[in-house]
Regions:
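Ferredoxin-reductase
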Residues: 1-46, 50, 64-66, 101-103, ...
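A short, basic/flexible loop-to-alpha-helix module at the beginning of a structural domain
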Residues: 51-63
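Histidine-anchored nucleotide/phosphate-binding helix
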Residues: 78-88
């Protein structure tokens, strides 16, 4: 892949499995990495990988014994991992998994999840299609209040976990809160910014996403596209950056903004000290002028 940057991958191996990783790569139009992985990678190719990271898991000490999993699209993967782990280890937990997908063709792992729901009495699974094929007789629509009440009428007794596209994520979380579920009983997986950051509320209208600025770091000056994060600009130039979540939370990729203007995407958890001294998270910061940064 040459100078292709590192990319976060959805792992689906149960936590107790050892010795290998399984990954799921969703095809994205004009994707930076997905096209290469899906169309060019061959059996026997080697990759350098960091270890899995993240905290989107069920916690037996703090979470309720009953779980409500709300999944959208390819974000079914963390739930598949947790479902396998809970069921095959014999844990005393009750799971309801509601999976929203456009159609059957893109509903990955549907057959396995259907089989598991028949084998294990403590696991209920329901697929909901928003653009169902003609003749489909299952549930249609979205993961809304009607669906939740129908398949998890005891939702107040459950810890809810949400993972999916940003729109679905916000919709489901707002729905659960309006239904009376407490914030402490909702766990959600954080994702990076929108594929088109220029459509995010707050983006300066005078800046075109394809506009190219200059980014100075040390003795190097590289191109930085307005619609791509500073992190991606650095990675495209072959400059390695410590990075983990790529969602504006962990701060591992933070840099100091010396000169220039940036757009800070929604969801960046910037510490007060970082804000005071000019540090930003490069994964959620987008150039709006020529820039100079320091590591």
């Amino acid at each position: 892949m040459g100078q292709e940057p590192p990319v976060p991958i959805a792992y689906r191996v149960p936590p107790k499995e050892r010795g290998y990783y399984e990954i799921t790569v969703a095809e994205i139009k004009d994707g930076y990495v997905s096209d290469y992985v899906l169309n060019h990678v061959q059996v026997g190719d080697h990759f350098l990988s960091s270890g899995p990271a993240g905290h989107f898991v069920y916690n037996t000490a703090f979470h309720k014994k009953k779980s409500l999993f709300l999944a959208g699209g390819s974000s079914i993967t963390p739930f598949l991992s947790m479902v396998r782990d809970i069921l095959y280890s014999g844990e005393d937990r009750d799971i309801v998994l509601l999976y929203g997908a456009r159609n059957l063709h893109v509903a990955i792992y549907h057959d396995e999840l259907t089989r598991l729901s028949k084998e294990f009495p403590n696991f209920a699974y329901q697929l909901v299609l928003s653009e169902a094929e003609e003749g489909y007789k299952g549930e249609k629509g979205f993961l809304d209040e009607r669906i939740i009440r129908k398949y998890a009428s005891d939702f107040q007794e459950r810890t809810a976990y949400i993972s999916g596209p940003n729109a679905m994520h916000h919709f489901c979380k707002d729905t659960l809160l309006k239904m009376g579920l407490k914030q402490k009983d909702i766990r959600d997986e954080v994702f990076g910014s929108s594929n088109d950051i220029t459509k995010e509320e707050g983006w300066p209208k005078e800046i075109d996403g394809n506009q190219i600025f200059k980014l100075k770091v040390g003795d190097q000056v590289v191109d930085a596209k307005a619609g791509e994060s500073i992190l991606v600009a650095l990675e495209r130039a072959g400059i390695r950056v410590n990075v983990c979540c790529r969602s504006g939370e962990c701060s591992l990729c933070r840099v100091k903004l010396v000169l220039g203007k940036v757009y800070l995407a929604n969801g960046m958890l910037l510490r007060l000290a970082d804000s005071k001294f000019g540090y930003i998270h490069s994964c959620k910061s987008y150039p709006n002028s020529d820039l100079e940064i320091e590591f």
